[in-house]
Structure formats: C-alpha cells, structure tokens
A protein has these predicted regions:
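Flexible "cap/lid" loop of the alpha/beta hydrolase fold
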Residues: 113, 117, 124-156
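Active-site loop/oxyanion-hole signature of alpha/beta-hydrolase fold enzymes
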Residues: 19-21, 57-104, 271
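Conserved serine/cysteine hydrolase catalytic core
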Residues: 192-244, 253
Length: 280
C-alpha cells in the first residue's frame, strides 16, 4: 500500500490531503498530522507509511491556503486561527473522524493545538514537534517581513522563500526533490503567496500563545513533545517550561534536529511516535 493523494470538497473549500490506510487495521484511532509554515502535508510523507504499517490510518492535509488545498480570497476566508479551526472541524466531519490522535509542528501547527484545547474530548493522544508553546514565542523575523506591506507582497511571491525558511529553520540542506514539492504551489499561482501573507498577518500570535499556554497547563491527555534542540526560532528552555506545566507528558530531545525535525529525522520520530501511540 502506498500513500494516496486525495482531495475532498468541504462546503466551498477543497482540501488536499495525503493518507494511508493500514492493510491490517489495528484498534487505534486515526492519526492526523498538521504542518507548519512553509511546510506542507509532504513533510509527513516519510512518517505516514511507518504508522500505516503498524495498523494506523494516517492523514495529513495541506492547510487551507497552502499547498494543493483551496486558496480562497481574504473576503471569503479570514485566515485567522478561528477560521482555520472551523475549516479543520468541517474537514474532520467530512472524513467522519470523531476521535483521533493529533501530531502538530510549527507556526500554524499551533492552530492544531488551539483546536485540541477547544475539543479535548476528541483527542486521544497529542504529539508536538517544534511548535510555539509560550508567550515568549515570536514569528521568526523572515516570516514577520513576509507579512509587511509591499515587502511582504514581494517576498511571498518568490518561490525561493521556501528554501530560505526550510533550510534556515532546519539548519540542513533540504533535498531538491522535496523543495520542488514545497515550491510547486508558488510557481503554479500567485494565490499561494497571497494566502501565505494573509496567514502570517492573521496568526494573532500574542493571543494565540496566551491561549496555548493556559491550554497546556490544563491538558490531561497523554502528550509527547519531540523537540529539535537546535531550533533557531523556538528555544529548548521554552519547550521544557511548557512541559513542566503539563500533567501527562514525556519529552524527547532530538539533539541534532532543529525547527523542522521531520524533514531529516523521520526515522527517529516515527519510532518515538509509534511507541507513544501504541501505549494503552
């Protein structure tokens, strides 16, 4: 079985997603993977088969406005955390997913956490890879510039923004075959850059982070934090402080990884995730 590329029309929005259903389904809830900026569902493509081979149905969408999902005009979609949460809720309903385990990474993966704290009864287990978790977290300067008037319009139309962010954030060269997937949407349509700009402009970091900080401290579902220690944007201390505030958490340090750990350390991450997700 290999990864399927699927799309589904939900209301007026088309979602693109990757999924793999297991040949021998085990008695586990599905696992939903949410990407950050400027990653896509593709960033999970080495991990999905590992989970499917162990009986999990694994699903990774491109967020609305990103990758191969719809890129609505800002008049039709607000690009705020609330708008993303509402769209995600409708996507899950369309796939008839009620309870699931959630894996998030990055800026925008953070919206997945906001979703989880609003719907704790739907989350079986939570795994967090390098995602902003504290009110100290700021958008990286390069991403901030992308949301500025004029400069942002220019920067977000340059497909090489992908290379700069992914390689700057992961501190490693990202293979061309992967960069081609990430650049593709920006080469295909100027809507991709516009949607990215709107997303960055509307992340509402201060209020989102306050929400996430308080959400984590009241969170009781089993959680695994997998942290690329060399992240240039999100310090290890902040992640550890967040973990300290939580009831039921294990912390896994990935000593050589940085902001996008799943790009280069998918083997270690799959192994950790499987141990965690299979626990009863």
């Amino acid at each position: 079985v290999s990864i399927e590329k699927k799309s589904i029309e939900v209301g007026s929005l088309e979602w693109f997603y990757l999924q793999e259903k297991p040949e021998k389904p085990a008695d586990y809830p599905p696992v939903l993977f949410l990407h950050g900026i400027p990653s896509l569902s593709h960033s999970w493509s080495a991990i999905i088969p590992e989970l499917a081979s162990q009986g999990f149905w694994a699903i990774a969408p491109d967020w609305i406005g990103h990758g191969r999902s719809a890129k609505p005009d800002k008049r039709d979609f607000a690009y705020t955390p609330e708008a993303f949460i509402e769209a995600l809720d409708a996507f899950l309903e369309a796939l008839q997913i009620e309870r699931f385990s959630l894996v998030v990474q990055g800026f925008l993966g953070s919206v997945g956490l906001q979703y989880a704290f609003a719907h704790p009864d739907r989350i079986e287990r939570l795994a967090i890879l390098n995602t902003p978790l504290s009110t100290n977290a700021k958008l990286p300067f390069k991403m901030q510039q992308m949301s500025w008037p004029l400069l942002g319009d220019m920067m977000t139309q340059d497909p090489l923004l992908v290379d700069r962010l992914l390689e700057g954030g992961s501190r490693f060269v990202v293979p061309d075959k992967d960069l081609n997937v990430y650049r593709g949407p920006y080469l295909a349509t100027s809507d991709s850059g516009r949607s990215l700009l709107m997303t960055l402009k509307n992340l509402q970091m201060p209020s989102a982070m306050a929400q996430i900080e308080s959400g984590l401290s009241g969170w009781e579902q089993p959680t695994q934090i997998l942290w690329g220690v060399l992240d240039p944007w999100l310090p290890l201390e902040d992640a550890k402080a967040a973990a300290k505030s939580m009831a039921n958490v294990e912390f896994v340090e990935l000593p050589e990884a940085a902001h996008y750990p799943q790009e280069h350390w998918s083997g270690e991450i799959s192994e950790s995730l499987l141990t965690f997700l299979r626990r009863r």
